[in-house]
Structure formats: C-alpha cells, structure tokens
Amino acid sequence: MAPSWRFFVCFLLWGGTELCSPQPVWQDEGQRLRPSKPPTVMVECQEAQLVVIVSKDLFGTGKLIRPADLSLGPAKCEPLVSQDTDAVVRFEVGLHECGSSLQVTDDALVYSTFLRHDPRPAGNLSILRTNRAEVPIECHYPRQGNVSSWAILPTWVPFRTTVFSEEKLVFSLRLMEENWSAEKMTPTFQLGDRAHLQAQVHTGSHVPLRLFVDHCVATLTPDWNTSPSHTIVDFHGCLVDGLTEASSAFKAPRPGPETLQFTVDVFHFANDSRNTIYITCHLKVTPADRVPDQLNKACSFSKSSNRWSPVEGPAVICRCCHKGQCGTPSLSRKLSMPKRQSAPRSRRHVTDEADVTVGPLIFLGKTSDHGVEGSTSSPTSVMVGLGLATVVTLTLATIVLGVPRRRRAAAHLVCPVSASQ
C-alpha cells in the first residue's frame, strides 16, 4: 500500500464559528479512495489551463448557490454554461487568463488567482441568504529538470511558505500555539488576541547559522506590494509594531540560533470588509559566531523602560531603531519598488535570505459589510442559517506522486472543501 496523506480543510464563518477537521485522502496502488463527504471545490492544474469545479452546495448546507454569483480571478471570468439540473459549476481558463498573476521563484512558476462567490439579491428582494466567499488558488510548476511536457508536475502547496535555497537552507514562517509547543492548526483569532510567530531556518549539514527577521509587512493578500499594508518589522530587525499600543515583541532568549520567535497583537484594516491578514517576512542568516550588528539584529521596544533592547548582542545596535536609520532604505521605500521576480541579488548572497509568507490569519467577530435581514445573535442560528462563510480558507498539502516518465504532466490535483466535516 502506498503512503497516505492527511490534510486540513477549514471553513471559517464570519459570525465567529469555525468548522475545521482533518480530511483524509488515501491512495492504494493508483486508486484514490474518496472522502466520506464529496468535495465542494475541485481544482486541476493542467499544462496550459486551470480547471475549477464548484459544487452548487458550496457551503455544505443544502442551500444551492447560483452560477451567476461565481466568478474567477480579478477579471471576474464567468463559468461555463450549465443547466439548472447540474450539480456543479465549471470553469476552464488558460493559466494567463482572468487576471491571474505569475510569480517566478528560484525553482517554480506560481500562478495565483481566486474563486469568488459574490451573491446578489434575487428579484425585488433586498435580503441575502449567503455572504461573499473567496477561495485562493495556486498552481506550482517546477522550473528544474527537463522542460518537455511530461516533465511538468503541478502541485498544490499550503499557503505557509517554505523556501529552499540552493545550499539546502530551508526558511519557514509558522503560526504557533501560545506555549510555542506546536504549530497552530487553525489560523483564527479574536481581536485582542496575540499571534505567536516562529521564523526558522533548517541548515542541514551547513555551518551553524543565526536567523534574523529583517522586515515584515501585513497585507490583505499574499502580495506584500499591495495596499493597504502595515509594517511590523523594519530597519533590519526593529519590531516597530511594538511602538503603538500593541505589546508586539521578539521572544528572548531564543530557543536556538536558527530560530526566532515573536508575538504580534492581532488587528484588522479599518474601512475594509475582509477579515484576513497575510504576513510576509524577509528572513536572512549570518554565521552563528558573528556578533549581531545594526544590519543583523532583533530589537523590541519596551514601553516600561521607553527604550529598545536586543534579543542578543550589545544594546547599542538597537539605537538606530528610534530614528529608523540603520544603514539602508526602510521597508516602506522598498515596498514602493516593482515586485521582484527572479534575481537582482548577487550569486554570493542568494542562499542567505528568503521572503516567506504565513496566512491568512482569520479574525472572527468582525462584522461583514454584507448584512442579512432578520438575523439573530444565536451561535446556532449563525452557523446553520445566516452566518455562511464570507471567507473560505484552503490549507493545502503538497502531495508528490511518482508517475511514469511517459505520463503527461496534466496532473489532476483534487482539493476538497467541505463545511460539514
């Protein structure tokens, strides 16, 4: 029997309810056993096009959505024509169509788009029975190896970035439980909570290294060049979010030189109905025996002492955080530059740093702009009748399957979504 994989799918309801449970997928000698509940969204990353199949019972409640309320990508591409009796809605678009974005990394081509459910009142009614929902979609195509058609194997990955460098350095950024003992399985928060973030580099057989968080920014989408944005870490390791009323800070001492932990008081952007946040950080490493300096540091602001203090190293390295003059232009100026694609860094430093993203962080209890008349405050009513998902989060696991060399790359990757787990 071939190995089995398990991944998590969460439906997050705007009213503060979360439906989340492990969804098993097995494979036995090439035969896939379907989960007990049919998936509501299926995605196929093919050689030149993207196929998205959506169940009309999108939220698993028995209330069917209208195909006209579904669209794909920023260009709002419409689905294929379907009959009223059809149980699914189907999209078939080219990888470059519908406003999809392409990101080129060192080892992959990443096409990103989203499925949107945007309900409109039916007829002369002024009420809505469902709310908006948005499903991020990504297709990853490896750049390495033979470029013939059968060599491309698209894969789904969870939107918790892990970056592999050429010298086998693996950078990661993860949400952790409050006691730091394990990774947080559900990215949901109430306003007033504190997010625990852990940046880490796995060095393998590399010489000992010390990890630093150079800068971090929070945005509403995975693209850190978008607006609005909020800077969390800047000036080569100054946790500037702690200057506000927040208590955000780096954790000292470190668990080890290759790990850096910090907390961020959760927030949402005013005047925006979305309740999701993505955090992107630029991570870098130095030799573990090098003394931290102004360009390589981890500094937190203490309101009680009204001063900056480092996780390690002399206190003088944090003085530049006060004026924001720590050697090079700040993050705010970097963000105004065009998005980086493949490489303006020199080959000497390409393995020393990486951009990693964690998200989305979901903030429960934030009122949606799309109200429902006649709603009640009962949690049961919110779950069953009126609090349908405005944001749908897919946590997707990378499944690497060995296929015969003659097989075409149009790998059919199924990502089930279910709200009834």
From Swiss-Prot:
Protein name: Zona pellucida sperm-binding protein 3
Region (Disordered): 331-351
Post-translational modification remark: Proteolytically cleaved before the transmembrane segment to yield the secreted ectodomain incorporated in the zona pellucida. O-glycosylated; removal of O-linked glycans may play an important role in the post-fertilization block to polyspermy.
Function: Component of the zona pellucida, an extracellular matrix surrounding oocytes which mediates sperm binding, induction of the acrosome reaction and prevents post-fertilization polyspermy. The zona pellucida is composed of 3 to 4 glycoproteins, ZP1, ZP2, ZP3, and ZP4. ZP3 is essential for zona matrix formation. May not have a sperm-binding activity by itself but may increase sperm-binding activity of ZPB.
Gene (UniProt): ZP3
Signal peptide boundaries: 1-22
Keyword list, A-Z: Cell membrane, Cleavage on pair of basic residues, Disulfide bond, Extracellular matrix, Fertilization, Glycoprotein, Membrane, Pyrrolidone carboxylic acid, Receptor, Secreted, Signal, Transmembrane, Transmembrane helix
Regions crossing the membrane: 382-402
All residue ranges annotated as the ZP domain in the record: 44-306
Record-linked PANTHER family: ZONA PELLUCIDA SPERM-BINDING PROTEIN 3 (PTHR11576:SF2)
Propeptide residue interval(s): 333-421
Extracellular topological segments: 23-381
Entry's free-text remark on domains: The ZP domain is involved in the polymerization of the ZP proteins to form the zona pellucida.
Cytoplasmic side: 403-421
GO molecular function terms attached to this record: acrosin binding; carbohydrate binding; receptor ligand activity; structural constituent of egg coat
Intracellular or extracellular location(s): Cell membrane
Organism superkingdom: Eukaryota
Species per Swiss-Prot/TrEMBL record: Sus scrofa (Pig)
Coiled coil location: none
Record carries keyword Transcription regulation: no
